[in-house]
UniProtKB/Swiss-Prot annotation:
It comes from the Bacteria. Homodimer. Quinone reductase that provides resistance to thiol-specific stress caused by electrophilic quinones. It is an enzyme of class 1 (oxidoreductase). It comes from Methylorubrum extorquens (strain CM4 / NCIMB 13688) (Methylobacterium extorquens). The keyword Metal-binding does not apply. GO terms for molecular function: electron transfer activity; FMN binding; oxidoreductase activity, acting on NAD(P)H as acceptor; oxidoreductase activity, acting on NAD(P)H, quinone or similar compound as acceptor. Its cofactor is FMN. Transmembrane segments: none annotated. This is FMN-dependent NADH:quinone oxidoreductase.
Amino acid sequence: MKLLHVDGSILGPHSVSRTVSAAIVDRLRAQHPGLEVIYRDLAGTPLPHLSGAVLAGAQPNATNTPDVQHDVELGRQVLEEFLAADIVVIGAPLYNFTLSSQLKAWIDRILVAGVTFRYGPTGAEGLAGGKRVIAVVSRGGLYGPGTPAAAAEHAETYLRTVLAFIGITAPEIIVAEGIALGAEARERALAGALDAAAALKAA
């Protein structure tokens, strides 16, 4: 069994989403001896943002510069990691009302027409179903249902939309929010998220 662990936070050891995503991976390792884990730190080793040159360079028989070819091959590697994974764990902080740009760059490499989705007579069809996806969404403020800022939350909502688009319709999402509202609020949010991580089912 293969697990892909992706972190999008820029805060390193101070990151709540990283702390909780690591706890999830540790729990799954304990539950699945022999679990193969691939880790992508998208802040430590950022992916280049998708460009027109790379889109063109990925076409059959394209003639690429070395830089573009390297980017094309990196994109293929990222996509293959995702396709090969049985479980995907994502650390997804909310920055300025949406995902980090580092995580968005990764998403742009896994949404590939004809591979993870396709268009048919009735619209788009996801092709990447069957994976277990667990995401940790950390938020500095309060954006949950019924809060004044709920409509400004575009991390969890975006993730759910993107994953459903490629066929993953039941992601497991753990939310830690209010982490910028003081030390006590941060500790409560982190403890609650870690409790939720500890309660995840084995398979």
